């Protein structure tokens, strides 16, 4: 009877389901084993690599013996020294590559190789092992054949010597080298699966990519060669030019200016010791020039040899840009030196002007200014700064004959021109002046120099000043001198009132001159003075005496000039508004004949500050250093101020011309200003004019000066007698808003009249005084319904 074989029971569903997670965990376990193997292999390879690189022949090893107690130099210790000695003796220099190869093989064996170039079929561990062994044999033999150094082991070690000797004996030197190279390539393929066709393909791609790069380099080399040829040609041209220059006449060099300006008669008188010491108490005496600092001796500018060298450099630099020109003259000055250039026929001035920065770079200077037109000459000017800049003192200018011979009490000492001659200007001929420049360009110092030049020229009987100083720093130092019409204005609301007073004074003077029959202030003063000298003083035609009060007719007196200084009118326009611009424009249009003149200064030369209305009425301008050509065109309607040197270097545009003059401003210290101010304070008390800063400026005929400078009706005095007062009162009490602009808009009246109505309500207790934010509270109850 056949034995019945028991039937295998099928696995239960629960068991089979329990095995599925184990199968799923197999890749995770394999990854874990690979990571552990890599962690174990990496330190061994590092140890082997360190032992090889720190090998020392003095250490005991396989090929030599040493003392047991002697120190071991190898980082791997005695074991490392033995291993390194064995590997180096067996494999030679290939031993250093052995850890890297073993590491790469371990990585491939553990993680696989999924990159391009991997053989599609799995070669198996046997072939990989064969490839590794073949690589060791081939590399040792190759090194022994190519790098034999005479040692016993040689570069390829004992193994390399055996392989190379065996192959050389059978195949000769050529056959041995070819056999070793082929074996090396095949073993690399077997060990790594690398495809040499892929390697050749990649090398081909690199070669193709290298083509455009080589083409670019070749193009650059060609350009360099052409540049070198052009440079050699220029050198040849320069040599020819040098021969021509040796035969040409030297540049005409004007002598430098004298360091000391010739003193005037007044300066000589001030140096004499007076017989009677004392100070005038009526302010009629002018301050002595001894209050100012004397100029100090300073270094000279360029020498004649340096000027000649600079002339040649300018010509060579222009020739680099294919511009033929010849320097025909050099004019050294205290701050800059002007070179006069005569361009060749057909050369445009714009070609030279566009090279100002390149010329400055070529001459190693800060900036170069190109003067397109020099009156009376057919040359172009190049203004180059001196290495050592001369400081110009205000005392030099005020002691000069040019300043002393000027009969006008409004003489301004601006500075020195490029030749070192004093530059003075008459404010009465300008008749107004606009000064603009960036911060630190010397604008404030120039304004102080202008003020002092007026104070040293005219007494307070001949000249009065109104100073507006929004910054409260520059002009406030003059507080208390007899020349001021009012205290130095720092509140911009009072500044607008002061300008309205000037408009009212201008209109009053015009009426006086019309009644007397003269055309300007000088004629008026001459006629009044002649009448006084004849013993028949002229009576004031505008004064209406009141017989009931016993008033007698008032005789006319000479009128002083009035100069209005505004240090930063950009801030004033921002605070007060556009109405100040209209007041300034009205004064600039009509105030010349009345003897009222404006000097405006700003550090923000933008079109919203220096507007077309101001520029049209103030043609005389001074531009200090600015940051761009746009700012220069805003001030002067032409470029050039951006190339100035700062510290008082300016372009002065005189009246009646479009060609600015370069002037170097005078320096005046704070100590000098304080000494002059203290002297003027001691010479006479202040004589402020009443009502200069009042908000309402009447013109004597029942009208007042409006916000724009035009006359407006007083509206019955601006109190409760105004016919619109009741209507304005109703509007304010109904709306509960005491706003000047609201009353002005609802009643369609002027700003000044609306302001007077609000002030009348304040006086009557209807509204409160303005609070810190300008708002008023309506105190009166609303009208009954």
From Swiss-Prot:
Topological domain ranges for the Cytoplasmic compartment: 200-785
Region of interest (Disordered), ranges: 1-26
SUPFAM superfamilies in alphabetical order: P-loop containing nucleoside triphosphate hydrolases, Winged helix' DNA-binding domain
Biased composition regions of type Basic and acidic residues, renumbered to the chain: 1-13
Coiled coil stretches, renumbered: none
GO cellular component: plasma membrane
Annotated family: Belongs to the FtsK/SpoIIIE/SftA family.
Stated name of the protein: DNA translocase FtsK
Source species: Xanthomonas campestris pv. campestris (strain ATCC 33913 / DSM 3586 / NCPPB 528 / LMG 568 / P 25)
Source lineage: Bacteria, Pseudomonadati, Pseudomonadota, Gammaproteobacteria, Lysobacterales
């Amino acid at each position: 009877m056949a034995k019945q074989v028991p039937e295998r029971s099928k696995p239960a569903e629960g068991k089979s389901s329990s095995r599925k997670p184990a199968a799923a965990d197999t890749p995770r376990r394999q990854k874990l084993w690979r990571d552990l193997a890599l962690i174990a292999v990496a330190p061994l390879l590092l140890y082997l690599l360190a032992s090889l690189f720190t090998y020392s022949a003095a250490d005991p090893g396989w090929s030599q013996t040493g003392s047991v107690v002697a120190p071991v130099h190898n980082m791997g210790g005695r074991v490392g020294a033995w291993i390194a000695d064995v590997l180096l003796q067996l494999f030679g220099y290939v031993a250093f590559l052995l850890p890297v190869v073993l590491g790469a093989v371990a990585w491939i064996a553990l993680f696989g190789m999924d990159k391009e170039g991997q053989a599609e079929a799995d070669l198996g561990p046997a072939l990989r092992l064969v490839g590794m062994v073949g690589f060791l044999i081939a590399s040792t033999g190759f090194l022994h054949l190519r790098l034999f150094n005479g040692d016993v082991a040689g570069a390829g070690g004992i193994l390399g010597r055996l392989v190379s000797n065996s192959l050389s004996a059978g195949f000769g030197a050529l056959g041995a080298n070819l056999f070793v190279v082929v074996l090396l390539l095949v073993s690399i393929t077997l060990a790594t699966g690398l495809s040499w066709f892929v390697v050749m393909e990649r090398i081909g791609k690199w070669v193709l990519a290298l083509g455009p790069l080589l083409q670019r380099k070749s193009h650059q080399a060609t350009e360099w060669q052409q540049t070198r040829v052009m440079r050699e040609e220029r050198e040849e041209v320069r040599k020819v030019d040098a021969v021509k220059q040796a035969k040409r006449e030297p540049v005409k060099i004007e002598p430098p200016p004298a360091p000391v300006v010739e003193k005037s008669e007044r300066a000589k008188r001030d140096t004499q010791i007076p017989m009677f010491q004392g100070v005038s108490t009526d302010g009629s005496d002018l301050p002595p020039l001894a209050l100012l600092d004397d100029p100090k001796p300073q270094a000279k500018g360029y020498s004649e040899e340096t000027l000649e060298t600079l002339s040649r450099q300018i010509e060579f630099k222009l020739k680099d840009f294919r511009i033929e020109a010849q320097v025909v003259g050099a004019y050294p000055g205290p701050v800059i030196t002007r070179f006069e250039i005569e361009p060749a026929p057909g050369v445009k001035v714009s070609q030279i002007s566009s090279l100002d920065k390149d010329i400055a770079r070529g001459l190693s200077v800060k900036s170069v200014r190109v003067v397109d037109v020099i009156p009376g000459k057919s040359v172009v000017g190049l203004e180059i700064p001196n290495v050592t800049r001369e400081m110009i003192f205000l005392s030099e200018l005020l002691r000069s004959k040019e300043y002393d011979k000027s009969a006008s009490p409004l003489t301004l000492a601006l500075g020195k021109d490029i030749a070192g001659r004093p530059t003075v200007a008459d404010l009465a001929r300008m008749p107004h002046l606009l000064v603009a420049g960036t911060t630190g360009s010397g604008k404030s110092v120039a304004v102080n120099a202008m003020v002092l030049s007026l104070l040293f020229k005219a007494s307070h009987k001949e000249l009065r000043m109104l100073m507006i100083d929004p910054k409260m720093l520059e002009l406030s130092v003059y507080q208390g001198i007899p020349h001021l019409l009012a205290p130095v204005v720092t509140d911009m609301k009072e500044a607008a009132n002061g300008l309205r007073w000037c408009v009212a004074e201008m209109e009053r003077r015009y009426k006086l001159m019309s009644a007397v029959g003269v055309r300007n202030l000088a004629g008026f003063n001459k006629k009044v003075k002649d009448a006084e000298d004849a013993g028949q003083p002229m009576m004031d035609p505008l004064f209406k005496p009141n017989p009931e009060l016993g008033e007698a007719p008032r005789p006319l007196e000479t009128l002083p000039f009035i100069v209005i200084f505004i240090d930063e009118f950009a801030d004033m326009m921002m605070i007060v508004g556009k109405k100040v611009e209209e007041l300034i424009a009205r004064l600039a249009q009509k105030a010349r004949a009345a003897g009222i003149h404006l000097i405006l200064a700003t550090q923000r030369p933008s079109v919203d500050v220096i507007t077309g209305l101001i520029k049209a009425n103030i043609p005389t301008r001074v531009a200090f250093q600015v940051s761009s050509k746009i700012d220069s065109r805003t001030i002067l309607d032409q470029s050039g101020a951006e190339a100035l040197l700062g510290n008082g270097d300016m372009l002065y545009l005189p009246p009646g011309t479009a060609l600015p003059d370069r002037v170097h401003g005078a320096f005046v210290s704070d100590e000098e200003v304080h000494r002059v101010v203290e002297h003027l304070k001691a010479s006479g008390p202040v004589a402020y004019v009443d009502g200069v800063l009042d908000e309402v400026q009447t013109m004597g005929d029942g009208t007042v000066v409006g916000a724009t400078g035009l006359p407006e009706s007083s509206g019955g005095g601006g109190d409760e007698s105004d016919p619109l007062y009741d209507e304005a009162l109703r509007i304010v009490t109904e709306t509960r808003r005491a706003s000047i602009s609201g009353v002005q808009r609802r009643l369609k009246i002027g700003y000044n009249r609306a302001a007077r109505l609000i002030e009348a309500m304040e006086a009557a207790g209807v509204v409160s005084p303005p609070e810190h934010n300008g708002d008023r509270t309506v105190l009166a109850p609303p009208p009954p319904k």
